Every structure is written in structure tokens, then in C-alpha cells.
Amino acid sequence: MSQKSKNPRNSYDDKFNIIFVGDENVGKTSIINRYINNTFLDEKKETIGIDNYSKMVTIKQKKILLKVWDTVGQEKIALMTKSHYKIAHEIILVCAIDNKDSFNSLNDWIENIKDNLPNETIPIFLMANKCDIEDTREVPREKLKELSQAYNIDFVECSAKENINIDETFTRMLNDIYQSNYIKNGLGLEEGSSSSGVNRVCC
């Protein structure tokens, strides 16, 4: 991806795209709204299609336009195609710790991504939502760790409702995207600035 040149129509240096996928009612829209608007939206939407949200962020003194794509109404894995994934700089899988079926389907989601993007290496990150309701947990942390290790992806337990590990996770993802794209373009970065390899649980 090439760096954007500033011009009268652009007030940012670059644009990053993150797409959220996963089963219905796991909190994808709630996570996005918590980060973009700092509000909790109980996920009751029935919109068909893909919604997108925008937020201007600053990374290493560069203005970045973040576009977050919410696959509302596209929760059936078969509906997701290359055209959905190819815009992404990072793909976020979401499950809910109180819904074991949403966890069990993650393997199918990951395989669907690989099938649609066989020659690309778009990073995948797992957010296990609703960690504030520990008493109804159906997905053991050990299972999350096993899946993370099996596919070499990072994961975090989070809560959109209680705002746990939301901002920190987006900051980590944005920094990783920035590093990946600017290294690829030979623009140089500080050594040792990567934040990858972080798995977080509720605390």
C-alpha cells in the first residue's frame, strides 16, 4: 500500500481498513461502537450488508483514517467472499465466551478466510467478547489459547459493555498495521516497536 500524499481533499496521511467477522450476537457492533463512540450498544441490529465506521487516529505523528467494517447480516460463513476480505489490513474474528457455538465456528471462519485469500497474508486477530459475565462462561481460556497457538494468531478477552481491553486492543492492531505497511514500503521504523504476541484476559 502506498503512502497517501497530502492534498486539499485529504486531511490524513494514510487509511487503514479493519473488518470484523464472526457469528451473530457475539458483540461485533458493540465492540466497534465502544471504540469509535465510547458508548455501549446492545447488539440488536438487523441490517443486511456491511456497515462501516470511521475514526481519525494519530500513529507516530501521522494522521490515519481508520475504517472499521462491520459485517452485520453477513454472519453465515458462506456469504463471505474475497470481495469482503480483500479490503482489509487486518481481520478481526469475534466470539463470545458465553456462547460455545460461536467459538466452535471459528475454525470454519479461519478456513473461509484462507480459502478466499490463498496467496495473501492478512493478519487475523481474535477478540473473545463478554468477559464481564464470567459466571456464564462456556469457552475456557485454555481453548482460546489452543486455537491461538494452532493458527498462530493473537487473542484477547474483552468486554464491550464494561470497556475492558477495547482501546488497548485497537491501539495494538493499528500499530501492527502501521509497522507492516511502512516496513513493506521501506519507510523505516524504530526497532523493537512491535506489540504482537500479546494475549490478554479480563482483569
Predicted segments, located by residue:
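Conserved P-loop small GTPase signature centered on TRAFAC-class small GTPases
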Residues: 1-29, 33-36, 58-63, 107-110, ...
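Generic enzyme active-site microenvironment
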Residues: 68, 94, 127
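Switch I (effector-binding) loop of TRAFAC-class P-loop GTPase G-domains
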Residues: 36-63
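Switch II (G3) loop of P-loop NTPases
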Residues: 64-78
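Conserved catalytic-core motifs of eukaryotic protein kinase domains, centered on the activation segment
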Residues: 42-46, 103, 137-138
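Inter-motif core of Ras-like GTPase G domains
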Residues: 78-100, 106, 112-116
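Conserved Walker B
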Residues: 72, 97-98, 131
